[in-house]
């Protein structure tokens, strides 16, 4: 027989005050969302590589010319170099191996990474050995040496990094905020308690994760980091004021030597004369960007004859050449692979706006200017990741301080 509502109430024991408190605590904990720091720790590096292609590589016997062509064909600025196992010491003492998925036998050893900057440095050194007379230098012969001979020409090539796929985005950002631009991530790793950065690794295959991948992830998840990304780059101390520039009438060969000497991957081109090849760019009007990737866009057949051009002339010729070419699919290269535009920001722009600039335009740095378009500094991908990470840590520390009071 159906009990009355009074009987039901009497049959139901009243919760004690302690039980009410526990229920409220449980309910609140379910509703409480993690802060930026906790959210970045919850997400893993494997999320960044989910839709990425397998590693693009070149054999250690490939020539520098072959490598430059491969970089251009794949629209990348760096490739790993593979060699037979047991013959080489990996860059930085690393042992990054690829094994057969069926037998586990090691079949490749990744001995290092070669970037466009390495090739740029090699070209610069060839020019120095040739007495600085580029028109008399046999560039073709210099480009026929094995790519293994240029590993480590730039600081980035001196080491090869791997990240465990279970590494948190937060730990990944710590590595990338220190100037590491890219790292290999093993496919199918089941290790949960591995160190974030590995020196020894063996896997059936790898994918590459870059600073840009992390920036793109942050930009797509901006609602989770709105308290950080809504702040200005000036307030977040994300602007690097140490910016070196070259004048627009500087010749490409001189710029290459200058970038090599200063270990720079890119320089702003400013509207100035000056007697110094590399000058303080602050307070000057920026008109162009010249980077190691610009050499990737220049066909090897034209490179030597174009080294004597000014930076602006070189950029114009490369842009005009690409506009006349059509890859498979019928789309003009000018529509899909044009050299990056000159991207600038004001100090008061939010970090969200700057991340959108680098993602949409696929550039690795944004020049910061004042209202008169005079250069104040730059914000690189490294600066963005450092600013987000430090802000997330500070917010977490502030929250811990409030809770402990």
Regions from the PLM with identified roles:
Residues 1-405:
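Tandem CBS (Cystathionine beta-synthase) repeat/Bateman regulatory domains
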